[in-house]
Swiss-Prot record:
UniProt region (Disordered), positions on chain: 187-211
Signal peptide limits: none
Name the UniProt record assigns to this protein: UPF0502 protein RB6530
Gene3D superfamilies, A to Z: Winged helix-like DNA-binding domain superfamily/Winged helix DNA-binding domain
Family of this protein: Belongs to the UPF0502 family.
Amino acid sequence: MNEENAAENESSQPKPLSATARRCLGVLVEKAKTTPDGYPLSLAGLITGCNQKSNRSPQMQVDESDALLALDELRAAGAAREIQGSGRVTKYRHAAYEWLGVDSPGAAIVTELMLRGPQTAGELRTRASRMHKFPDLDSLKTELDSLIEKGLVESLTPPGRGQTFAHCLYTPQERLYLVDKIKKQDASSAAPSQAESGSTSPAKAANDDRIDKIQERLDSVTAKLEALEKRLEFLES
């Protein structure tokens, strides 16, 4: 019976998407939450959102052909829909809640991971809060645990400070590359920490606490910079 349930859960999980399709889906969800007056999006608006410099990693240069292929992929998967806007302009909207089986907080986290790639819980709380407010880190972690249980998010590194999370919509080849990249980063950072392993336990604890406080300040500064970037984009549009 457990095997049947596991097979059913696996078959119901969303299938991997191409990088451009993930970017398009992320933009549709993001704009629906942050600029609802301009949503649903036209093809031109979607392309602009895919290629914007703020809140994106990696940077992409999506053209009309790329976007149309990605939209075909999303519609075939049931993750996006085409509608007729005013003046017979074709527009697009996401169906992420139904396709992913999530609510607002879950959609915000998965969207942020699609738009920026792997992140820590602290980074996700700061960045995803522009789409859904997370009052504290515990509330973010509770939602992360739920997404992990649903097979939508996974942890790429062991639990602890700096634990990194990623969505589960990568293609198998992309995921292998990503895991290998994370392993190399961990290996390069392990050497200095081993050299410092002779530090006394109280000193190490104090140092970790100082680093955590610095990270909190960096998260706060990052959030303010992102708000300024968003404001500049609005003024320039």
